[in-house]
Amino acid sequence: MIIKRILLIFIILLLLFPTANATILNLVVGDTIYPTRKHVSSLHKTIELDEVQVIGQRKLFSIRKDTTFINTDCLRVRKGANLEDLIRNIPGMEYDKANRQLSFKGKPLNGVNINGETFMGNDIIAALENMPTDAVELLKLYDMLSALEKMTGVDDGADNYVLDIKTKSTYNGSLTGTLTAEHGNRDRRRDEVQGNLFNADGENTSLTLRSDNLSNMNIGGNNFQNILSGNIVKKFGKKITLNASLSLNAFHNGSENHDYDEQYLSSGTKYRESMLLSLSKNHSNAANINLQYNIDKKTLLNISANGNFGRSDNLTDNTTYLYERNTAADTLTSGTLRNNTKSNGKNYHVSADLTRRIGKAGASFTVKATLGGNSNETNNTSLSLTKFHHLRNAVGGDSLLLRNLCQQLPTLRNESRISLQYTHPFGKQLKLQTGYGLHHEEDRNTSNTYDYTIPNRPYIDSLSYENTLSICGQELTLRMDYKGKQWKINSGIDVEWQRRNICRQHNSETVDYTVKATEYKPKFGAKWNNGKIEVELRYNGNTQQPSIQALLTLDDKSNPLSVKIGNPQLKPAYQQQLSIRLNERKYGITFMGNYHNSFNDFAEEVTYVPPPEQCVTL
């Protein structure tokens, strides 16, 4: 009987758990599920699953090789938020909107990409404001190589860390848009229309129109900011990629400030009260275009151009009272200063490079050319009136210091470079690059000052000048790039021999002379990574030449109370910076250290001239 029962149980188990090639799923949170075929025992039953749900804690950060991934599903933001709201919730991410700087764990980010392509011309503010959070699936942080660096295989040594956004598949190929109208008390408002079209291959189109008065804390009906921005990335087959962006910005801001402070001195307590009225009107227009053309597998052409034009009108009205006691009857000095500054500025930059690989080893030649410049015209009108109530003039009244000046400050700068580079590989991991180039630069700045207190507005020689600097140079570059399994080493040096011609006209005097100078720019970077710990060491050095004003022996009397005299014997200064960074991946711990110093730095010697025995006051 017992034997029959055992035999019956064995037959039932055999029917329920037949021998088969069952599919076993190895599940890991965050990984793709790959089925593996294994021969299993007859005691295992093949189960076909329609759905697998894995419940576990998601990680906000993950690191693979040199790329940091940020899982945005772990972050919560309000509905309709933009990318700026999202990054402010990321630990270690710092955003300084006033200085247009974005950094992660102390490392500056140079731009924002969409699916691997540049977004909004690397304008960080425009990218963060125009990207909706709902479209973001994943954020990636890495050091992005340019198309030229990928072609030659040599890193130029400059950090180019970017924030790359992977869009959700539901948004790819779909046109999305938002319409926002927010109005509150004290006439606060924000109106915005936005449209986006993203593709997984990096193509994207974005257009935003916004008008608001939330960009500053000053309340007023005339304060506003209007922005029109757009971006397009278009690929023509596999060879041509076009990237263009446009930004138009108008900003008006008025404010009123009242200050009061006390100074406790040995001679007695002083009280100061001031009122400042200011009005700023700024308009800026910027455009950027890049074209990448892969002519064939061995030839690459890059062309880029960008420029901007802006104008501003700033008016300030400042009134100040200084009391010996906190009563108006004991006023020591009182003054008013009205300053109006109007400026028109523009700059441009055009560059092109052509790279051709030769031979089977991967050697290449590169021709690079750049052309850039900027100009600015500034008109500054100032009216200053200061009364010294305890200092009597010749007729017994309060002494008066009156200034009514107009300064015209035009500046102009043009620069051009052309170079030839040769890259030679030594195996698959080591490459050497050498190059030779020519450099020309010309800077000119002028100050024309007029006295508006006199009806005919005479020209003031002592407060006017014209400076011109012309540089002709030859540049030699050497660079080494090594990429191994754990080590990445990049080092190089740029040496430029310059002929600098300096000319200055001031107070009917002219100085014109030529000097020779040599500039050194060494760079070194090493990174070691074993998968758990990453250690990075960087060194940068550069030669800094003294300014025109510091070299000229002519007296600079633009400020009568501080007359400056240059020193033609000044030598160049050398500045260097050493940084080390250690990143522990498991616990996300980062250590950073920086050291910088200067050799032969510039300093000013101050000599106080005693006042004359007799002073004439007006």
What are these model-predicted stretches?
Residues M275, E415-R417, Y459-Y465, E475, ...:
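Outer membrane beta-barrel strand-and-loop segments of large Gram-negative receptors
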Residues I9-P18:
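Bacterial N-terminal signal peptides
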Residues M217-N218, R272-L277, T333-N340, L401-Q408, ...:
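Extracellular loop and loop/strand-boundary signature of outer-membrane beta-barrel proteins
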Residues D155-A158, D259-G268, N318-A328, S382-L391, ...:
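Flexible, surface-exposed loop regions and adjacent strand-edge segments
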Residues S304-N306, G310-R338, T366-L409, G437-L463:
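Surface-exposed, low-complexity loop segments enriched in small/polar and acidic residues
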